[in-house]
Amino acid sequence: MSSKEVSTFRLYLMRFVYLLNFVLLGSDVWPAIFRHQGAWDPVKGVAFSFWAALSLVSGLGLRYPLKMVPLLLLQLVYKAIWLLAIGLPMWSAVRSSDLAHAMLIGVVVDVIAIPWTYVVASYVIEPGDRWRRQALGARTYRQNA
């Protein structure tokens, strides 16, 4: 198996994570958005908007699990940052929460589901997209036949 190939099991595992996001996160966030009354706290509004978008776009991951890998990476990174910046101080102060446990489980699930060999091959080793229409120094010549 090449570094760009992903096992069928891993594809189904990724689809399971996307499905969890779509169904569980969506069923929690969307009703809260539609039933909310009054003005939102701006920071809380950003968080709910982000989670709503994450749940919605996760639906695409069911059909295109590899194309949506950046979504899983984003999810992993935001949860890891939350655990380090907010969760760790809570645990240090012996004030653990259900949210901290959910974030920790989410990080573990993301680390297991993400096809790391594919990520390295696609986003680290493979050359990036060009920045210009034409590479610097490249010239096009018209051949006269």
Regions found by a protein language model. Name each.
Residues 1-8, 144:
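Short, Lys/Arg-rich, polar N-terminal cytosolic tail immediately upstream
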Residues 64-68, 99-100:
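Membrane-helix interface segments
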Residues 19-27, 42-63, 76-84:
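Core segments of alpha-helical transmembrane spans in multipass integral membrane proteins
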Residues 29-37, 60-63, 88-93, 119-122:
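Juxtamembrane "helix-exit" motif on the non-cytosolic side of transmembrane helices
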Residues 36-45, 70-73:
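Short, amphipathic, aromatic/basic-enriched membrane-interface segments that mark the entry/exit
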Residues 6-7, 16-41:
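Membrane-helix boundary elements
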Residues 108-135:
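Membrane-water interface at the C-terminal end of transmembrane alpha helices
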Residues 85-103:
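Membrane-helix boundary connector in multi-pass membrane proteins
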